[in-house]
């Protein structure tokens, strides 16, 4: 083999090695590009997923805020309705309290009422000796009916007539004044207590109005508003 043949063989080997290297490099390049595209696609999908999750989270938060706002508005409206209902009911009670003043103006009827109130207290206390307090302006009426009240109680309770001491030093408050309707006052009635003061029966017109109003409040609300509310 001469030098020319050797040179040609070497050139062929070089071309073969170069071609093989180029093919291998091309394969590596294609593979790398495929891996890059796959990784890029995965990153894009991951970012899309994150964006969707963030959007869903914000959407849920917005829904929660809407529900909270609606609940607060609904509660505020309910409070306003209840307040308006309370105002109406309290206005009725205030008017009833004003009407109580008319009770004592009918002397004959009020005198009979005082006797009945005294008898009720005596039946509740069931004490042989009690202290009675009334308004100073009612003192004469109370003293006028006291004996009859004691006898009526004794007949109903089947006991001896009790000793009833009328307090002429400390009286119940006077009727409410027009310039101070919410000051300390009493529209009429009596308060009886055991002599040791441990048992008290408050039978004033104001106290009876409070009790009656409290007991009838559900009925009043239902009659006015069509439902019973707390």
Swiss-Prot record:
Coiled coil feature spans: 8-67
Membrane topology term: Peripheral membrane protein
PTM annotation (Phosphoserine): residues: 178
Main location per the UniProt record: membrane
Disulphides: none
InterPro entries, per database record: ATPase_E_C, ATPase_V1_Esu
PANTHER family (UniProt xref): ATPASE H+-TRANSPORTING V1 SUBUNIT E1A-RELATED (PTHR45715)
Family, per entry: Belongs to the V-ATPase E subunit family.
Protein name: V-type proton ATPase subunit E1
Taxon lineage: Eukaryota, Viridiplantae, Streptophyta, Embryophyta, Tracheophyta
């Amino acid at each position: 083999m001469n030098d020319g043949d050797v040179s040609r063989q070497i050139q062929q080997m070089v071309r073969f090695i170069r071609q093989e290297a180029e093919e291998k490099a091309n394969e590596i390049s294609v593979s790398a590009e495929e891996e890059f595209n796959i990784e890029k696609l995965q990153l894009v999908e991951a970012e899309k997923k994150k964006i969707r999750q963030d959007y869903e989270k914000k959407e849920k938060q917005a829904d929660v805020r809407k529900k909270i706002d609606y609940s607060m508005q609904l509660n505020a409206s309910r409070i306003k309705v209840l307040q308006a209902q309370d105002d109406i009911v309290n206005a009725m009670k205030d008017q009833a309290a004003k009407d109580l003043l008319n009770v004592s103006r009918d002397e004959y009827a009020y005198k009979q009422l005082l006797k009945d109130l005294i008898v009720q207290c005596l039946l509740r206390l069931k004490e042989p000796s009690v202290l009675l307090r009334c308004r100073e302006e009612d003192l004469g009426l109370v003293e006028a009916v006291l004996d009859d009240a004691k006898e009526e109680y004794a007949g109903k309770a089947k006991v001896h007539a009790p000793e009833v001491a009328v307090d002429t030093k400390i009286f119940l408050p006077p009727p409410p004044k027009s310039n101070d309707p919410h000051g300390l006052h009493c529209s009429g009635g009596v308060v009886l207590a055991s002599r040791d003061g441990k048992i008290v029966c408050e039978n004033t017109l104001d106290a009876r109005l409070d009790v009656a109003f409290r007991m009838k409040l559900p009925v009043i609300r239902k009659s006015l508003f069509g439902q019973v509310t707390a």
